[in-house]
Amino acid sequence: MTRSPLAEGILRRKLAEAGITCVEVTSAGTGATDGLDRDRMMLEVAAEAGYEISGKTRRADSMSAIGSDLILCMEPHHVSYMKGIIPHSYHHRIHLLMKWALGSSEVVYDPTCRPKDFYMSVLADLERACEAITQKIDRQ
């Protein structure tokens, strides 16, 4: 699991910097196995950028999803997965991250087993999205 914990770390920091304390941010992966170590390259990229993403992997589950006000997914198949594990009445909470944050059709692709530059590109995409999310929340 690489992108979700990085997005969580970025968003937590941006919200804190904006003085927004009423939002709880968590992450989970649709393909993750609970309790594994995080991706080493993503840990390195995150640390270089000053983000804290320590912890273990966590698989997305229906109870956590139902308890969430907003579920942001990296790729369309994640949206489908999430819609498959929660009741239809909660589907309105599920969105593609880049579409919800920036109105963009971009997808945040999985950098696993790719060069470090690809990880850096994912970091930049997530920073843009998390900045936009922070601004949206701050305006509410």
Predicted regions and their residues:
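Phosphate-binding/catalytic loops
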Residues: L70, P76-Q140
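Conserved active-site segments centered on acidic
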Residues: M1-S68, Q135-Q140
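Helix N-cap/beta->alpha junction signal
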Residues: S4, E75-P76
